[in-house]
Amino acid sequence: MMIASFAIFLSHIIFITYATSNQRYFKPNMHNNMTITIRRTITKTATAIAVLHSDNGNINGTIHFQQDKNSTTISGEIKGLTPGLHGFHVHQYGDTTNGCISAGPHFNPYNKTHGDPTDEMRHVGDLGNIVAGADGTAHIDISDKHVQLLGPNSIIGRSLVVHADQDDLGKGVGDKKDESLKTGNAGGRVACGIVAISA
């Protein structure tokens, strides 16, 4: 009788231990699955800023960059410009020791010719034109899929430059064609600033 009772008691212990162990086995898996799902919904966002000015201090502006999954938004305003269109580009170097000329050529990691921002054949740094109103202020709101703040072709540490003239977007003809495919015939550099990581 004692042996039978002990066997029943032992079977209860074994059953209870198995059930408890089974619950402990599934709970971490449920937790891990939830964690993985949450992590997959997180997207990387990066932000940067460029404070632009001219050598004489008459032109000033602040431009903000925000990169999400699909594109980079470029926004802000620049004051003190002559009314009209001005070429707007990211240049190779974050060097302004000799003014904007030290910034080098357009940022062009894929060795393409200059073009319209909507063209596939364009420099990464080609942002087209900005428009200054009668008061000399240009309001900027650009979305660009080529400009990146993350990765090997990041524009962080490079220069953002405003030019004196309108960018012809690589469509120049005749004696202007060669320069059009390099700079868009956008003229001198009137203001610039280094693109830096923002807080």
UniProtKB/Swiss-Prot annotation:
UniProt KW keywords: Antioxidant, Copper, Disulfide bond, Glycoprotein, Metal-binding, Oxidoreductase, Secreted, Signal, Zinc
Pfam families: Sod_Cu
Residues with glycosylation annotation: N33, N60, N70, N111
Residues the entry annotates as binding Zn(2+): H106, H114, H123, D126
Binding site for Cu cation: H89, H91, H106, H163
Root EC class: oxidoreductase
Cofactor section: Cu cation; Zn(2+)
Cofactor binding note from Swiss-Prot or TrEMBL: Binds 1 copper ion per subunit.
Reactions catalysed: 2 superoxide + 2 H(+) = H2O2 + O2
Cysteine disulfide links: C100-C192
GO cellular component: extracellular region
Recorded coiled-coil stretches: none
Signal peptide: 1-20
PANTHER family (UniProt xref): SUPEROXIDE DISMUTASE CU-ZN -RELATED
Assembly: Homodimer.
Family statement: Belongs to the Cu-Zn superoxide dismutase family.
Protein name: Extracellular superoxide dismutase [Cu-Zn]
Species of provenance: Brugia pahangi
